[in-house]
């Protein structure tokens, strides 16, 4: 949460692709957030007692986070008005990733699926996730994490392999330095050693992250307006 907040604050206060070493350092540390979320979804799916409610919670916050995220970064609330990329927050592909885990999981799923059907559905989920923050990679990486539970080395290296494709797109289409920074997800490795694989006992924790995520984006959006924008930027553009 600290890494994510620092990263978003840096993007709000110093927008663009500044090359100051300390700014790059903040964004590098911010790469901790995404893989942590992917681990959270894989473990949340594994330990949830009610998958339907878990999915409903993710969907509700995906909708709320869409408006908060776009407000924070000045992205139009009208999808695809300016771009097909980065049109909504990472909560949307996390929601799709949870569906992907259910599709993959022959034990929990209440209906049979052949392998080609599972592959086809996962491709559709990736397509639906494509316009969001981190694109389709939360779907792919979360599934990889779930498939390799108990093998942290394989989980992390697999994520890095997937993110290599994301880095290539960044480097070719946006910015080389910031593209390479995406490899910073690997710094999650030592932190994941502290997770013991058990379900947390604090009931409030299942709500805290989502509420904090939406709330901090709104506050960053207000800060953006104060520093850089005017009332028209509430709607992006």
Q: How would you describe each model-predicted region?
A:
Residues 1-237:
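Alpha-helical transmembrane segments and their immediate juxtamembrane cytosolic regions
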């Amino acid at each position: 949460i600290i890494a994510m907040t620092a990263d978003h604050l840096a993007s709000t206060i110093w927008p663009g692709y500044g090359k100051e070493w300390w700014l790059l350092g903040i964004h590098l540390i911010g790469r901790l957030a995404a893989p942590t979320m992917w681990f959270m979804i894989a473990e949340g799916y594994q330990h949830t007692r009610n998958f339907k409610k878990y999915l409903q919670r993710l969907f509700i916050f995906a909708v709320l986070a869409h408006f908060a995220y776009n407000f924070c970064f000045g992205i139009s609330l009208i999808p695809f008005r300016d771009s097909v990329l980065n049109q909504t927050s990472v909560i949307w592909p996390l929601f799709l990733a949870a569906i992907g885990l259910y599709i993959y999981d022959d034990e929990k799923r209440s209906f049979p699926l052949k392998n080609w059907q599972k592959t086809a559905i996962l491709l559709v989920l990736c397509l639906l996730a494509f316009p969001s923050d981190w694109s389709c990679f939360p779907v792919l990486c979360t599934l990889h994490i779930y498939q390799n539970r108990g093998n942290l080395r394989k989980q992390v290296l697999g994520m890095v392999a997937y993110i290599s494709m994301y880095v290539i797109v960044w480097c070719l289409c946006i910015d080389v330095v910031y593209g390479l920074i995406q490899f910073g997800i690997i710094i999650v490795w030592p932190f994941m050693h502290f997770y013991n694989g058990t379900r947390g006992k604090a009931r409030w924790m299942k709500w805290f992250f989502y509420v904090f995520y939406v709330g901090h984006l709104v506050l960053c959006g207000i800060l953006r307006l104060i520093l850089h924008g005017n009332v028209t930027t509430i709607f992006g553009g």
